[in-house]
Swiss-Prot record:
This is UPF0283 membrane protein BAbS19_I09770. Keywords: Cell inner membrane, Cell membrane, Membrane, Transmembrane, Transmembrane helix. The chain crosses the membrane at residues 78-98, 109-129. It comes from the Bacteria. Its main location: membrane. The keyword DNA-binding does not apply. It is a multi-pass membrane protein. PANTHER family: UPF0283 MEMBRANE PROTEIN YCJF (PTHR39342:SF1). It comes from Brucella abortus (strain S19). The keyword Membrane applies. Residues 1-36 are annotated as: Disordered.
Length: 357
Protein backbone atom coordinates (compact mmCIF):
# COMPACT_ATOMS: atom_id res chain seq x y z
CA UNK A 1 0.00 0.00 0.00
CA UNK A 2 1.25 3.49 -0.79
CA UNK A 3 1.33 6.22 1.83
CA UNK A 4 0.04 8.78 -0.71
CA UNK A 5 -3.68 9.43 -0.80
CA UNK A 6 -5.10 8.79 -4.26
CA UNK A 7 -6.53 11.80 -6.10
CA UNK A 8 -10.28 11.98 -6.27
CA UNK A 9 -11.74 11.68 -9.75
CA UNK A 10 -12.59 15.07 -11.24
CA UNK A 11 -14.01 16.22 -14.58
CA UNK A 12 -12.06 18.54 -16.94
CA UNK A 13 -12.53 19.78 -20.54
CA UNK A 14 -10.02 19.25 -23.33
CA UNK A 15 -9.41 22.29 -25.47
CA UNK A 16 -9.74 21.44 -29.16
CA UNK A 17 -7.03 22.88 -31.42
CA UNK A 18 -8.17 25.35 -34.00
CA UNK A 19 -8.95 23.64 -37.28
CA UNK A 20 -7.60 25.30 -40.36
CA UNK A 21 -9.83 24.99 -43.33
CA UNK A 22 -8.23 23.59 -46.44
CA UNK A 23 -10.16 26.04 -48.49
CA UNK A 24 -8.57 28.99 -46.65
CA UNK A 25 -5.05 27.80 -47.52
CA UNK A 26 -5.74 27.91 -51.25
CA UNK A 27 -5.07 31.13 -53.02
CA UNK A 28 -7.84 32.92 -54.73
CA UNK A 29 -8.10 31.58 -58.28
CA UNK A 30 -7.01 33.90 -61.07
CA UNK A 31 -9.78 35.26 -63.14
CA UNK A 32 -9.76 34.11 -66.74
CA UNK A 33 -8.36 36.62 -69.21
CA UNK A 34 -7.16 36.68 -72.80
CA UNK A 35 -3.41 36.64 -73.46
CA UNK A 36 -2.30 38.82 -76.31
CA UNK A 37 0.96 38.85 -78.31
CA UNK A 38 1.81 35.26 -77.41
CA UNK A 39 5.29 34.52 -78.79
CA UNK A 40 5.53 31.33 -80.79
CA UNK A 41 8.83 29.62 -81.56
CA UNK A 42 8.75 27.58 -84.70
CA UNK A 43 11.78 25.31 -85.14
CA UNK A 44 13.43 25.72 -88.50
CA UNK A 45 14.85 22.79 -90.36
CA UNK A 46 18.55 22.87 -91.16
CA UNK A 47 18.91 23.68 -94.83
CA UNK A 48 21.97 21.48 -95.06
CA UNK A 49 20.35 18.34 -93.66
CA UNK A 50 20.30 15.75 -96.41
CA UNK A 51 17.12 14.07 -97.49
CA UNK A 52 17.05 10.34 -98.05
CA UNK A 53 17.30 10.78 -101.82
CA UNK A 54 20.32 13.10 -101.56
CA UNK A 55 22.07 10.75 -99.14
CA UNK A 56 21.45 7.84 -101.51
CA UNK A 57 22.95 9.82 -104.41
CA UNK A 58 26.06 10.55 -102.35
CA UNK A 59 26.50 6.95 -101.29
CA UNK A 60 26.66 5.97 -104.97
CA UNK A 61 29.83 8.07 -105.19
CA UNK A 62 31.43 6.08 -102.38
CA UNK A 63 31.61 2.38 -103.25
CA UNK A 64 33.46 0.06 -100.93
CA UNK A 65 37.09 -0.37 -101.83
CA UNK A 66 38.18 -3.71 -103.22
CA UNK A 67 41.90 -4.18 -103.76
CA UNK A 68 42.44 -5.70 -107.20
CA UNK A 69 44.44 -8.90 -107.30
CA UNK A 70 47.19 -8.76 -109.88
CA UNK A 71 49.02 -11.90 -110.86
CA UNK A 72 52.10 -12.20 -113.02
CA UNK A 73 54.08 -9.48 -114.72
CA UNK A 74 52.35 -6.71 -116.62
CA UNK A 75 53.89 -4.90 -119.59
CA UNK A 76 54.37 -1.75 -117.55
CA UNK A 77 56.29 -3.64 -114.87
CA UNK A 78 58.52 -5.25 -117.50
CA UNK A 79 59.14 -1.87 -119.14
CA UNK A 80 60.05 -0.02 -115.95
CA UNK A 81 62.10 -2.97 -114.71
CA UNK A 82 64.18 -3.04 -117.90
CA UNK A 83 64.64 0.74 -117.83
CA UNK A 84 65.71 0.54 -114.20
CA UNK A 85 68.37 -2.05 -115.01
CA UNK A 86 69.70 0.05 -117.90
CA UNK A 87 69.85 3.17 -115.73
CA UNK A 88 71.68 1.21 -113.03
CA UNK A 89 74.26 0.01 -115.58
CA UNK A 90 74.69 3.55 -116.90
CA UNK A 91 75.24 4.96 -113.42
CA UNK A 92 77.72 2.18 -112.61
CA UNK A 93 79.76 2.71 -115.80
CA UNK A 94 79.76 6.49 -115.30
CA UNK A 95 80.93 6.09 -111.69
CA UNK A 96 83.70 3.70 -112.70
CA UNK A 97 84.96 6.03 -115.44
CA UNK A 98 84.88 8.96 -113.03
CA UNK A 99 86.88 7.10 -110.38
CA UNK A 100 89.47 5.96 -112.98
CA UNK A 101 89.83 9.52 -114.26
CA UNK A 102 90.34 10.84 -110.73
CA UNK A 103 92.96 8.15 -110.01
CA UNK A 104 94.78 9.25 -113.16
CA UNK A 105 94.90 12.82 -111.89
CA UNK A 106 95.78 12.09 -108.27
CA UNK A 107 95.57 9.05 -106.04
CA UNK A 108 93.91 10.90 -103.18
CA UNK A 109 91.15 12.13 -105.51
CA UNK A 110 90.53 8.58 -106.67
CA UNK A 111 90.39 7.17 -103.16
CA UNK A 112 88.09 10.01 -102.06
CA UNK A 113 85.73 9.35 -104.97
CA UNK A 114 85.81 5.62 -104.24
CA UNK A 115 84.92 6.23 -100.58
CA UNK A 116 82.07 8.57 -101.53
CA UNK A 117 80.79 5.98 -104.01
CA UNK A 118 80.84 3.29 -101.31
CA UNK A 119 78.92 5.55 -98.91
CA UNK A 120 76.35 6.29 -101.63
CA UNK A 121 76.03 2.58 -102.40
CA UNK A 122 75.49 1.73 -98.72
CA UNK A 123 72.85 4.46 -98.38
CA UNK A 124 71.12 3.24 -101.54
CA UNK A 125 71.09 -0.33 -100.22
CA UNK A 126 69.61 0.88 -96.91
CA UNK A 127 66.88 2.77 -98.77
CA UNK A 128 66.05 -0.28 -100.88
CA UNK A 129 65.90 -2.45 -97.77
CA UNK A 130 63.61 0.02 -96.03
CA UNK A 131 61.29 0.16 -99.05
CA UNK A 132 61.16 -3.62 -99.26
CA UNK A 133 60.26 -3.83 -95.57
CA UNK A 134 57.54 -1.20 -96.08
CA UNK A 135 56.14 -3.09 -99.07
CA UNK A 136 56.14 -6.31 -97.08
CA UNK A 137 54.35 -4.56 -94.22
CA UNK A 138 51.75 -3.22 -96.63
CA UNK A 139 51.26 -6.66 -98.14
CA UNK A 140 50.89 -8.18 -94.67
CA UNK A 141 48.14 -5.68 -93.88
CA UNK A 142 46.31 -6.65 -97.07
CA UNK A 143 46.61 -10.36 -96.20
CA UNK A 144 45.47 -9.65 -92.63
CA UNK A 145 42.33 -7.95 -93.94
CA UNK A 146 41.49 -11.02 -96.00
CA UNK A 147 42.27 -13.40 -93.15
CA UNK A 148 40.11 -11.44 -90.70
CA UNK A 149 37.20 -11.30 -93.14
CA UNK A 150 37.51 -15.02 -93.85
CA UNK A 151 37.70 -15.90 -90.13
CA UNK A 152 34.61 -13.80 -89.37
CA UNK A 153 32.69 -15.32 -92.26
CA UNK A 154 33.53 -18.94 -91.34
CA UNK A 155 33.41 -18.26 -87.57
CA UNK A 156 36.79 -19.96 -87.26
CA UNK A 157 38.20 -19.46 -83.76
CA UNK A 158 41.74 -20.55 -84.60
CA UNK A 159 41.98 -18.23 -87.60
CA UNK A 160 40.40 -15.43 -85.58
CA UNK A 161 43.00 -15.78 -82.80
CA UNK A 162 45.78 -15.70 -85.37
CA UNK A 163 44.36 -12.55 -86.99
CA UNK A 164 43.87 -10.84 -83.63
CA UNK A 165 47.44 -11.66 -82.60
CA UNK A 166 48.69 -10.08 -85.83
CA UNK A 167 46.55 -7.02 -85.10
CA UNK A 168 48.06 -6.79 -81.61
CA UNK A 169 51.54 -6.84 -83.16
CA UNK A 170 50.68 -4.02 -85.55
CA UNK A 171 49.02 -1.92 -82.83
CA UNK A 172 51.74 -2.55 -80.22
CA UNK A 173 53.47 0.74 -81.04
CA UNK A 174 50.29 2.85 -81.13
CA UNK A 175 49.57 4.49 -77.74
CA UNK A 176 45.88 5.04 -78.52
CA UNK A 177 45.28 1.29 -78.58
CA UNK A 178 46.85 0.48 -75.19
CA UNK A 179 43.58 0.44 -73.27
CA UNK A 180 41.81 -1.62 -75.92
CA UNK A 181 44.63 -4.16 -76.09
CA UNK A 182 44.58 -4.54 -72.32
CA UNK A 183 40.82 -5.11 -72.29
CA UNK A 184 41.08 -7.54 -75.19
CA UNK A 185 43.75 -9.57 -73.38
CA UNK A 186 41.47 -9.93 -70.36
CA UNK A 187 38.47 -11.08 -72.41
CA UNK A 188 40.09 -13.29 -75.05
CA UNK A 189 39.74 -16.52 -73.04
CA UNK A 190 36.03 -15.84 -72.37
CA UNK A 191 35.08 -15.73 -76.06
CA UNK A 192 34.36 -18.96 -77.90
CA UNK A 193 33.16 -17.63 -81.27
CA UNK A 194 35.68 -16.46 -83.84
CA UNK A 195 33.30 -13.89 -85.30
CA UNK A 196 32.75 -12.31 -81.89
CA UNK A 197 36.50 -12.18 -81.25
CA UNK A 198 37.07 -10.37 -84.55
CA UNK A 199 34.31 -7.88 -83.77
CA UNK A 200 35.63 -7.29 -80.24
CA UNK A 201 39.17 -6.69 -81.50
CA UNK A 202 37.87 -4.26 -84.10
CA UNK A 203 35.80 -2.39 -81.54
CA UNK A 204 38.40 -2.13 -78.79
CA UNK A 205 41.55 -1.59 -80.84
CA UNK A 206 40.47 0.11 -84.05
CA UNK A 207 37.63 2.31 -82.80
CA UNK A 208 39.94 5.02 -81.35
CA UNK A 209 41.94 5.01 -84.57
CA UNK A 210 38.77 5.25 -86.67
CA UNK A 211 37.67 8.25 -84.65
CA UNK A 212 41.00 9.99 -85.20
CA UNK A 213 40.94 9.05 -88.89
CA UNK A 214 37.51 10.63 -89.34
CA UNK A 215 38.86 13.82 -87.78
CA UNK A 216 41.85 13.84 -90.14
CA UNK A 217 39.64 13.30 -93.19
CA UNK A 218 37.17 15.99 -92.12
CA UNK A 219 39.89 18.57 -91.44
CA UNK A 220 41.58 17.87 -94.78
CA UNK A 221 38.24 18.17 -96.57
CA UNK A 222 37.54 21.49 -94.86
CA UNK A 223 40.90 22.89 -95.90
CA UNK A 224 40.38 21.82 -99.51
CA UNK A 225 36.88 23.29 -99.49
CA UNK A 226 38.08 26.66 -98.20
CA UNK A 227 41.00 26.87 -100.63
CA UNK A 228 38.73 26.00 -103.55
CA UNK A 229 36.23 28.66 -102.53
CA UNK A 230 38.84 31.44 -102.40
CA UNK A 231 41.34 30.39 -105.08
CA UNK A 232 41.17 32.31 -108.37
CA UNK A 233 42.38 29.48 -110.63
CA UNK A 234 41.34 25.87 -111.07
CA UNK A 235 45.01 24.89 -111.31
CA UNK A 236 45.48 26.06 -107.72
CA UNK A 237 42.57 23.85 -106.67
CA UNK A 238 44.04 20.77 -108.31
CA UNK A 239 47.50 21.44 -106.90
CA UNK A 240 46.23 21.87 -103.38
CA UNK A 241 44.04 18.78 -103.63
CA UNK A 242 47.12 16.78 -104.68
CA UNK A 243 49.14 18.16 -101.77
CA UNK A 244 46.39 17.65 -99.20
CA UNK A 245 45.53 14.17 -100.45
CA UNK A 246 49.17 13.10 -100.33
CA UNK A 247 49.56 14.33 -96.78
CA UNK A 248 46.25 12.77 -95.74
CA UNK A 249 47.20 9.34 -97.07
CA UNK A 250 50.56 9.43 -95.30
CA UNK A 251 49.00 10.52 -92.01
CA UNK A 252 46.35 7.80 -92.19
CA UNK A 253 49.02 5.21 -92.95
CA UNK A 254 51.03 6.30 -89.92
CA UNK A 255 47.89 6.33 -87.78
CA UNK A 256 47.06 2.68 -88.50
CA UNK A 257 50.68 1.55 -88.22
CA UNK A 258 51.19 0.90 -91.94
CA UNK A 259 53.98 3.43 -92.61
CA UNK A 260 54.36 2.83 -96.36
CA UNK A 261 57.56 3.91 -98.04
CA UNK A 262 57.94 5.74 -101.30
CA UNK A 263 57.23 2.67 -103.41
CA UNK A 264 54.25 1.76 -101.26
CA UNK A 265 52.90 5.25 -101.56
CA UNK A 266 53.06 5.03 -105.36
CA UNK A 267 50.48 2.25 -105.17
CA UNK A 268 48.10 4.66 -103.46
CA UNK A 269 48.81 7.39 -106.02
CA UNK A 270 46.83 5.63 -108.74
CA UNK A 271 43.64 5.85 -106.74
CA UNK A 272 44.39 9.47 -105.84
CA UNK A 273 44.89 10.37 -109.51
CA UNK A 274 41.57 8.73 -110.38
CA UNK A 275 39.81 10.82 -107.75
CA UNK A 276 41.55 13.97 -108.93
CA UNK A 277 40.32 13.30 -112.47
CA UNK A 278 36.76 13.27 -111.13
CA UNK A 279 37.48 16.42 -109.14
CA UNK A 280 38.71 18.22 -112.25
CA UNK A 281 35.53 17.43 -114.19
CA UNK A 282 33.40 18.65 -111.30
CA UNK A 283 35.04 22.08 -111.51
CA UNK A 284 33.29 22.71 -114.84
CA UNK A 285 30.18 24.29 -113.44
CA UNK A 286 27.09 24.13 -111.29
CA UNK A 287 25.21 21.79 -113.62
CA UNK A 288 27.56 18.92 -112.86
CA UNK A 289 27.35 19.72 -109.14
CA UNK A 290 23.57 19.44 -109.30
CA UNK A 291 23.84 16.04 -110.95
CA UNK A 292 26.22 14.77 -108.26
CA UNK A 293 24.91 16.15 -105.00
CA UNK A 294 21.27 16.81 -105.84
CA UNK A 295 19.40 19.88 -107.02
CA UNK A 296 18.27 20.80 -103.52
CA UNK A 297 21.72 21.29 -102.06
CA UNK A 298 23.27 22.90 -105.13
CA UNK A 299 20.51 25.48 -105.30
CA UNK A 300 21.38 26.65 -101.79
CA UNK A 301 25.03 27.32 -102.63
CA UNK A 302 26.78 29.63 -105.03
CA UNK A 303 28.73 28.07 -107.88
CA UNK A 304 32.16 28.66 -106.32
CA UNK A 305 31.10 27.49 -102.89
CA UNK A 306 29.47 24.47 -104.48
CA UNK A 307 32.75 23.59 -106.17
CA UNK A 308 34.47 23.91 -102.80
CA UNK A 309 31.99 21.50 -101.24
CA UNK A 310 32.40 18.94 -104.02
CA UNK A 311 36.21 19.17 -104.00
CA UNK A 312 36.05 18.66 -100.25
CA UNK A 313 33.84 15.62 -100.80
CA UNK A 314 36.31 14.17 -103.27
CA UNK A 315 39.09 14.65 -100.71
CA UNK A 316 36.91 12.87 -98.16
CA UNK A 317 36.42 10.04 -100.63
CA UNK A 318 40.18 9.75 -101.07
CA UNK A 319 40.54 9.60 -97.29
CA UNK A 320 37.87 6.90 -97.03
CA UNK A 321 39.62 4.88 -99.74
CA UNK A 322 42.90 5.27 -97.85
CA UNK A 323 41.20 3.99 -94.69
CA UNK A 324 40.03 0.95 -96.63
CA UNK A 325 43.59 0.27 -97.77
CA UNK A 326 45.56 0.83 -94.57
CA UNK A 327 43.01 -0.43 -92.01
CA UNK A 328 44.15 -3.87 -90.76
CA UNK A 329 40.59 -5.22 -90.38
CA UNK A 330 37.66 -4.59 -92.74
CA UNK A 331 34.68 -2.68 -91.42
CA UNK A 332 32.50 -5.23 -89.69
CA UNK A 333 31.53 -4.21 -86.17
CA UNK A 334 32.15 -0.52 -86.88
CA UNK A 335 30.24 1.49 -89.46
CA UNK A 336 32.23 2.39 -92.54
CA UNK A 337 32.34 6.17 -93.01
CA UNK A 338 30.67 7.57 -96.10
CA UNK A 339 30.54 10.83 -97.97
CA UNK A 340 27.24 11.65 -96.28
CA UNK A 341 29.09 11.91 -92.95
CA UNK A 342 31.01 14.95 -94.21
CA UNK A 343 28.59 16.80 -96.50
CA UNK A 344 26.79 18.63 -93.69
CA UNK A 345 29.98 19.99 -92.10
CA UNK A 346 31.41 21.09 -95.44
CA UNK A 347 28.20 22.80 -96.52
CA UNK A 348 27.86 24.62 -93.19
CA UNK A 349 31.50 25.71 -93.34
CA UNK A 350 31.08 27.32 -96.75
CA UNK A 351 27.72 28.79 -95.78
CA UNK A 352 29.19 30.43 -92.68
CA UNK A 353 32.06 31.82 -94.71
CA UNK A 354 29.66 33.24 -97.27
CA UNK A 355 27.56 34.80 -94.50
CA UNK A 356 30.57 36.59 -92.99
CA UNK A 357 31.42 38.26 -96.28
Amino acid sequence: MSDKTPRKPTAFRLEQPARVSAASEQEEPRRPRAVKDLEQITPQADVFDLTDDEAAELEILDPAFEAPERKGWSLSRILFGALGILVSFAIGIWTEDLIRALFARADWLGWTALGVAMVALAAFAAIILRELVALRRLASVQHLRKDAADAAERDDMAAARKAVDALRTIAAGIPETAKGRQLLDSLTDDIIDGRDLIRLAETEILRPLDREARTLVLNASKRVSIVTAISPRALVDIGYVIFESTRLIRRLSQLYGGRPGTLGFIKFARRVIAHLAVTGTIAMGDSVIQQLVGHGLASRLSAKLGEGVVNGLMTARIGIAAMDVVRPFPFNAEKRPGIGDFIGDLARLNSDRNARK
